[in-house]
A protein has these predicted regions:
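Glycine-/small-residue-enriched transmembrane alpha-helix faces in small-molecule transporters
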Residues: 1-41, 151-178, 200-202, 309
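Juxtamembrane helix-entry segments on the extracytoplasmic side of multipass membrane proteins
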Residues: 5-9, 33-37, 41, 64-71, ...
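Alpha-helical transmembrane segments of compact multi-pass small-molecule transporters, enriched
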Residues: 11, 23, 45-50, 103-117, ...
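Helix-helix packing/entry segments at the starts of transmembrane helices
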Residues: 17, 40-42, 81, 85-86, ...
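Hydrophobic/small/kink-forming positions within alpha-helical transmembrane segments
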Residues: 18-21, 25, 52, 77-82, ...
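Specific transmembrane alpha-helical segments of multi-pass solute transporters/efflux pumps
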Residues: 19, 23-24, 52-104, 140, ...
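Hydrophobic transmembrane alpha-helices of multi-pass small-molecule transport proteins
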Residues: 51, 123-145, 259, 279-298
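Transmembrane alpha-helical segments that form core, pore/gating elements
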Residues: 51, 111-113, 117, 148-211, ...
Length: 309
């Protein structure tokens, strides 16, 4: 790969993780004026329109699939896309944006562990090291440094909901690896957005406390900007940038950039005037170290092996 192509890939991945990280405090700010379900409807609605227009522009027809394949793709999308967004934004209404970003930083690791269980393979030493270190960093933040809370399972309810959303997304990510062999990713993502929109819309219909139309008409310009940012940049833009980066540097190298999500979340939260504590920064550093150290050790072994070859 040329240096210019490599630089472009790095910029794409950094911009992508900025969009994703910023979506946490931006979403937290929007929840001051709209219900979590209303926010998710906006996100899915905007993303669906943008992805549809992109697919039409690129002349991407819907694939020809069997009813079983359609059912599987829609079902997995409802669990993953719907579960993530429902858990994330419902949880953010009750917890700190930085906590949410830290919990979501566990997703690549959890996806790897799900793969190990599904394939009946024992996780690698690097994966186990990352699991212990990263969980320690996350639990440090979620318990406010009082690990005695673990004995009584005393966690913030919002943190628990986001954790469940992260599990849904990790399962979705693993299952998507199989679906991608027979369904292109852009149409698959569009199906995911439409499936999520349908499920959340049904939930809104049966939720007496949620009034998306009235809430949308009453929002301020800043919150309208928040919703547009989450829908366009935090969803569609981030996804397309991620695909572009992965194609150029590979999935393994690209996954390292996921470590920047909590960093950008903290920076954006600070810009919004939201609280960023020293404990959260320490937990963030521990999580990033837990994810990076095994990769750096592996790279070092590979370099030594190439020198000795």
């Amino acid at each position: 790969m040329s240096r210019s192509a490599n630089t472009t890939a790095v910029l794409c991945l950094l911009l992508c993780t900025f969009f994703w990280g910023a979506s946490f405090p931006v979403g937290k700010h929007a929840l001051n004026e709209v219900n979590a379900l209303t926010l998710v409807v906006w996100r899915f609605g905007i993303a669906s329109v943008c992805l549809y227009l992109y697919a039409k522009y690129k002349h991407m027809p819907l694939p020809t699939l069997t009813p079983k394949q359609w059912a599987w793709a829609i079902g997995v999308s409802i669990i993953g896309v719907g579960g993530l967004n429902l858990g994330l934004f419902t949880g953010l209404a009750q917890t700190n944006a930085n906590n949410g970003a830290l919990i979501m930083a566990l997703s690549p690791l959890v996806t790897s562990l799900i793969g190990s269980v599904a394939q009946r393979q024992f996780p690698t030493r690097g994966a186990l090291f990352s699991l212990v270190v990263c969980l320690s960093g996350v639990l440090l933040v979620l318990t406010d440094g009082a690990f005695a809370k673990l004995l009584g399972f005393e966690f913030n309810h919002g943190d628990q909901i986001i954790f469940l959303g992260m599990l849904c997304w990790s399962l979705y990510t693993y299952l998507t690896q199989g679906i991608s062999s027979w369904m292109p990713m852009i149409p698959y993502t569009l199906v995911g957005m439409l499936s999520g929109l349908g499920v959340i819309s049904l939930m809104v219909l049966f939720s007496a406390d949620v009034h998306p139309i009235q809430e949308s008409l009453a929002i301020s310009r800043s919150v309208f900007g928040d919703l547009m940012f989450i829908g366009i940049f935090g969803t569609v833009g981030g996804y397309l940038l991620w695909i572009s980066g992965v194609k150029q540097v590979g999935a393994t190298n690209a996954s390292l950039f996921f470590n920047f999500v909590p960093v950008f979340a903290a920076l954006t939260a600070f810009a919004y005037g939201q609280q960023v504590t020293a404990l959260q920064l320490l937990g963030m550093a521990i999580v990033i170290a837990g994810l990076l150290i095994p990769r750096l050790v592996e790279w070092q072994y590979q370099r030594v092996g190439l020198r000795n070859a």
